Regions:
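Glycine-rich phosphate/adenosyl-contacting loop at the front of the ribokinase-like
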Residues: 1-47
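Short, well-structured alpha-helical segments that form the helix of a local strand-helix-strand
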Residues: 157-161, 218-233, 252
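Short pre-catalytic strand/loop immediately N-terminal to key active-site residues, enriched for Gly-Thr
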Residues: 188-199
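Active-site cofactor/substrate anionic-group-binding motifs, chiefly glycine-
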Residues: 40-93, 98
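General beta-strand structural signal in soluble alpha/beta enzymes
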Residues: 27, 49-52, 97-100, 124-128, ...
């Protein structure tokens, strides 16, 4: 397998492609984070649409560049819309990204995610350490939608999920993991304040979907999306903040300001932020 290029130039190229193509990214997500997800998608250069009705969702998927299925809100109507939209996107060959929010916390969520995995092909799956561990069928500590506990084997776990689902897996945590069946990348970027803002995980899911909709190959899309997202978190902190609210504003501004030209100016040590397991 060819290594993915990790450099300021490669990241700039992905950002440029995303902004030039302006992919339409359909989100079926939750009401808690929907506004920040839509805005971050727009600020990356993609076009967000939040069509999530049982009829409207599958119809909108016909023209989408990528679809994000987020299980942060589970009810009968939305759950069915999530399922049918994923099926419709598959039928058109449109990349589908799964964010299994809360996987491992309730039987209802578990049943929905398992149904999605059984019937829908996913270009990428993004979840926190606990959610990815629960997807693997291992014991995970998920409290509500938050991952708690220790996950020393998360790289192996993410790779196992990638192999079983034939997809790219992004496991977000202190060190982000991007895994396929035959490669594992550890991404060292981000800031601790990202964990103090509700919705950063959902925004990462939207970011992965945006890059998958604009960048042709899924692994580079997921890897560059994860790296860019962490860099934005660091830049938001560098702007100065009084607490989570001002940091959140800085974060969205930093997404907007990470242009292809800005990415090219990132120092040459960027490659050191990503380590491939051998």
């Amino acid at each position: 397998m060819t290594d993915v290029a990790v450099s300021a130039e490669a990241l700039s190229e992905s950002l440029s492609t995303l902004r030039e193509t302006e992919p339409l990214i359909q989100h079926l997500t939750n009401r808690v984070t929907i506004n920040d997800v839509a805005n971050s998608t727009l600020h990356w250069g993609a076009l967000p649409v939040m069509a999530d009705g049982p009829a409207d969702g599958p119809e909108m998927a016909q023209g989408a560049s990528a679809v994000l299925l987020n299980t942060g809100q589970v009810n009968d109507s939305l759950s069915e819309a999530i399922y049918e939209t994923g099926v419709a996107a598959n039928e058109r060959g449109i990349p589908v990204v799964l964010d299994p929010v809360g996987m491992g916390s309730t039987p209802t969520r578990n049943d929905l995610v398992e149904r999605l995995l059984a019937d829908i092909d996913f270009a990428a799956i993004k979840g926190n350490y606990g959610e990815i561990t629960a997807l693997a069928g291992a014991e995970a500590e998920v409290r509500g939608v938050e991952s708690v506990g220790e996950y020393d084997e998360i790289a192996d776990t993410a790779q196992a999920v990638a192999e079983s689902a034939d997809t790219v897996v992004v496991a977000s945590g202190e060190t982000d993991i991007v895994a396929t069946a035959d490669a594992v990348y550890r991404v060292d970027s981000g800031h601790e304040m990202m964990g103090e803002v509700v919705g950063t995980g959902c925004m990462l899911g939207g970011t992965v979907a945006s890059f998958c909709g604009g960048v042709e190959e899924t692994l580079p899309a997921a890897l560059h999306a994860t790296l860019a997202f962490g860099l934005v978190g660091e830049r938001a902190a560098e702007m100065g903040y009084n607490g989570p609210a001002s940091y959140r504003t800085n974060f969205l501004d930093s997404v907007w300001n990470l242009t292809p030209a800005e990415a090219e100016e990132i120092d040459s040590a960027l490659a050191d932020r990503v380590e491939r397991d051998t």
